[in-house]
Amino acid sequence: FSLFLVFSLVGCAVNPVTGKQDFVMISEEQEIQMGREYNSQILKMNPVYEDQELQEYVQSIGESLALKSHRPNLIYRFTILDSPDINAFALPGGYIYINRGLMSYFSSEEELAAVLGHEIGHVTARHSVRQYSQSQLMGILSAAIEINSGRTAGNIANLASGALLSG
């Protein structure tokens, strides 16, 4: 119970989108640092699409949308990856990626804006941060159960927390 109370007090922040309390264990500065580190990994594994004019165009549209978001002061980085996959995704701290494969399906600026807006929504609502915090909490709770109840109970707690986090 005392562990729960500590995490309840330490890990609550107001979600900028919903205005409600959210359980998060990292600050905005830590979120940005996490995004920076993940960005470095993403760019090592995925080449950037080599069309500077198109990159600037996507950045411009993304920035204009981000200025109207719930976190307009965050610096957003929009990057087209040279991948044929039909995908877009966001990392903590304002890093947003869209694959060349998805770009080829757009027939209007509005369609691009809709996808970028969706990804901005993930960043502004801190979805990755909340998921990371829940994962950390489940790991801590599993370790506490294992210490207090033995390895089998800890393994069961790990399995249960994994199932909860994966949906």
What are these regions (language model features)?
Residues 12-167:
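A Zn2+-metalloprotease active-site environment signal
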Residues 1-12:
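Sec-dependent bacterial lipoprotein signal peptides
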